[in-house]
Design a protein with these regions (language model features):
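N-terminal amphipathic/basic leader segments beginning at the initiator methionine
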Residues: 1-17
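Active-site pocket-shaping loop/turn-to-helix segments
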Residues: 16-38, 61-62, 85-99, 122
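Short acidic, glycine/serine/threonine-rich loops at helix termini
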Residues: 19-21, 66-67, 123-130
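Phosphate/pyrophosphate-binding loops at sites that engage ATP/ADP/AMP, CoA/4′-phosphopantetheine
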Residues: 39-51
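Short glycine-rich phosphate-binding loop at a beta-alpha junction
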Residues: 50-58
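Conserved catalytic cysteine-centered active-site region
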Residues: 59-112
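Flexible glycine-/small-residue-enriched beta->alpha junction loops
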Residues: 111-134
């Protein structure tokens, strides 16, 4: 079996701010991830949401609000058929998910996938619990 080429089409970056009481402190991680997906789809109208078959979600750390990150695809409006997986590789989570999605494409498991990374270093497990995932 010959491996197919995987192509990175586009990338977006979430905003960042000061830790602690910065402007994004109250912003939920699942909402940040959903905004990234929505922006990618807006910038690439040739990619229909139904074309996406898998979404890798990387997070660095053990924040309480990563428990429902699988909902990112639903909050972004992707079809329920889009599968997703989560990876915690500390500082390498987003790269790990990008590699796994690329491998899936190269091996023919699917044709189109997304990789998303979200983290909040200012609010780790046990630091001001509350406001979990949607």
């Amino acid at each position: 079996m010959k491996a197919r080429n995987a192509v990175l089409v586009d990338g977006v970056r979430s905003p960042f701010a000061r830790g602690g009481r910065g402007k994004l402190e109250a912003t939920r991680l699942d909402e940040v991830g959903a905004l990234l997906i929505k922006e990618l789809l807006r910038r690439n109208p040739q990619v229909e949401p139904t074309m996406i078959e898998d979404c890798g979600i990387g997070h660095g750390g053990s924040q309480y609000d990563v428990a429902g990150l699988g909902n990112i695809t639903r909050l972004a409006g992707l079809p329920v058929e889009v599968t997703n997986f989560m990876t915690d590789r500390q500082c390498g989570s987003s790269m790990e998910t990008a590699q796994r999605v690329a491998m899936g494409i190269m091996l023919g498991s699917y044709d189109c996938g997304l990789s998303v990374g979200v983290e909040r270093m200012g609010r780790t497990m046990g630091a001001g619990m509350g406001g979990g995932p949607k």
